[in-house]
């Protein structure tokens, strides 16, 4: 069985260094049994980056009404009235993005960004800088935690997670100067300072398919397509952490590659 020490050693072997800023996407099942469970994986990650390092994860929200309000869809009024507002202190994380985010959020020094559907969680010296502000309409593009993550020299870590989970490539989609990007609207229940719930409308890029060709069921989206092309260049690190095949990417490099890829393949003639 793996331990905090063995996972930390594996992370260092992969290229994680003290002081690093890491955005982690993890499959705990792929990592395999670890003494102490998921909390020990978080401890190993924190040990690997040290007290000067910062970890970030894509928490989202387990009660996000994104699909229920997408592009003008109307919820049943009773359901809408009873839907809980997003609360930084108590709202759960979306399990589809990995259970590790819940354990990151439980850290005493964790900070969480205020965009309900695109909420990020961070721990470490840069946590507040990364997570604040995070407004509706700036989910994963300019003005988002992802932009600040890239700007601060972050690295993307996949622990047994698939290549379609490289969330920072949504930032590349947002900033790439290409035509015909898909946009969506949705609503989120926000808790005001007066304790009242207000449903607020957001408009943003479509993270489920930035172009029509990437929004086809059963076909790879832009994130997976770009990540696979990037891996072929060999500018990343690969290794095994626990039992998990793992990747380490320089965020700025893969984002720059992603922007160039989109321009070359889908830019205006």
UniProtKB/Swiss-Prot annotation:
Keywords: Acyltransferase, Antibiotic resistance, Transferase. GO terms for molecular function: aminoglycoside 3-N-acetyltransferase activity. Its EC number is 2.3.1.81. InterPro entries: Amioglycoside_AcTrfase, Antibiotic_NAT-like. Pfam families: Antibiotic_NAT. It catalyses: a 2-deoxystreptamine antibiotic + acetyl-CoA = an N(3)-acetyl-2-deoxystreptamine antibiotic + CoA + H(+). GO terms for biological process: response to antibiotic. NCBIfam families: AAC_3, AAC_3_II. Resistance to antibiotics containing the 2-deoxy-streptamine ring including gentamicin, kanamycin, tobramycin, neomycin and apramycin. Belongs to the antibiotic N-acetyltransferase family. This is Aminoglycoside N(3)-acetyltransferase III. It comes from Serratia marcescens. The gene is aac3-Vb.
